Amino acid sequence: MSAAPTSGPLTCRRAGPLRGAIEVPGDKSISHRSLLFGALSTGETRVTGLLDAEDVHSTRKAVEALGAIVREEGGEVVVTPPATLREPGDVIDCGNSGTSLRLLTGVLSGVPGLSVLTGDASLRRRPVRRVIDPLRAMGANLSARDGDRLPPVVVRGGPLRGARQVLPVASAQVKSAILLAGLFAEGETTVVEPEKSRDHTERMLRGMGVPVKVSGLEVSVSAARPAGGRVDVPGDISSAAFFLCGAAALPGSEVTVRNLGVNETRTGLLDVLRAMGADVWLANLREVAGEPRADVTVRADRLEATEIRGATIPRLIDELPVVMVMATQARGRTVIRDAKELRVKESDRLAAMGETLARAGARIELYEDGCAIEGPTPLRGVEVRTRLDHRIAMSMAVAQLFCGGEPVVLDDVACVATSFPSFFRLLDQVAARVSVGGAP
């Protein structure tokens, strides 16, 4: 293909095993936090490897609206913070980014003035009460649509008090919103999780000089401002998952993803791949700016079914759609439970993947909090309604590898720009051919 598709329908056709070495774009979670924490800091923050995608653009526009200056300089993104965050002059549009909206809700709760946070049609259907309730317990003045369930969110910033918050569901976004509000609060703020969620907020704040106390599943902060500094963003394991899962299940495949973030709160996928029998190894393991990274190689092998539940779920929640695809090629019954969080992402990902894979021939049973998939099952070509969800689109592009040459037609791929604009170019690079406009 001559150029990666950016919008409109797209037809994927299999072109043999996946082979090669690639680098995926910067981690989305770390990229968001780099910009936001830089805006909160007392000094300049310089970021390398920042993800260039729509979600991160939303955070950049938001911090600029709060008075930060963000510029590109010599291959780095430089964030110069204001002396104090200012009241925004207009509504802050977070686009499709739930991370932007939730983390900003925590920050703006402690910033004097009126702020309104909204987003696109998809974001305005995503729940915010789980953030509003704990922030209100700290004294935040917040309101939202539909009985405080849905965005837009209106924030009237003011004094906050520290509190001990026990979360019913492990969520890095909710945890981070509370901790960021805690930087503005009087007294200590503590978050207790039922399971460990991704810990980029804790690592990055500590790296910027904020005292962060971690004890088991408890995290505590007190009022402080980060000092700024340097952030080197590793590759995003959630983006790499499409290639790693495809390589694990497609005979003859071997893919290496270089400079990949392997923070232990994000490597549930690697544990699952090993449990299913794939060959997985890490090389060049090192730690940069507080985040471990490595070159990760996956080689195809005969996959066996496994169970995925409990503490593993928060460590691979975003990867589960493509794990569901991989499970169709594993021998036996793969069971995923405790993943109800999938129902409140950009789409109801359990329902979307279940319905689409079933039409493609998969033997799948859905539960309220997960699914069971029998395999191995040859898939067939299918037309996919992506629901404007980037992970549905990319997961079903991978599913096409197992369709025996039959095409998978995605109704619109513009959503891929949310997190991974170069996805189809890299997929082409490691051997899967795509074509645009519905043509083979």
From Swiss-Prot:
Involved pathway(s): Metabolic intermediate biosynthesis; chorismate biosynthesis; chorismate from D-erythrose 4-phosphate and phosphoenolpyruvate: step 6/7
EC number: 2.5.1.19
Gene Ontology biological-process annotations: amino acid biosynthetic process; aromatic amino acid family biosynthetic process; chorismate biosynthetic process
Gene3D superfamilies in alphabetical order: Enolpyruvate transferase domain
SUBUNIT field: Monomer.
Name of protein: 3-phosphoshikimate 1-carboxyvinyltransferase
Domain of life: Bacteria
Pfam families, per the entry: EPSP_synthase
Family to which this protein belongs: Belongs to the EPSP synthase family.
Catalytic activity field: 3-phosphoshikimate + phosphoenolpyruvate = 5-O-(1-carboxyvinyl)-3-phosphoshikimate + phosphate
Enzyme type, top EC level: transferase
Function of the molecule: Catalyzes the transfer of the enolpyruvyl moiety of phosphoenolpyruvate (PEP) to the 5-hydroxyl of shikimate-3-phosphate (S3P) to produce enolpyruvyl shikimate-3-phosphate and inorganic phosphate.
Cellular component, GO annotation: cytoplasm
List of residues binding phosphoenolpyruvate: 28, 98, 126, 173, 349, 391
NCBIfam families: aroA
Source organism of this protein record: Anaeromyxobacter dehalogenans (strain 2CP-C)
Keyword annotations: Amino-acid biosynthesis, Aromatic amino acid biosynthesis, Cytoplasm, Transferase
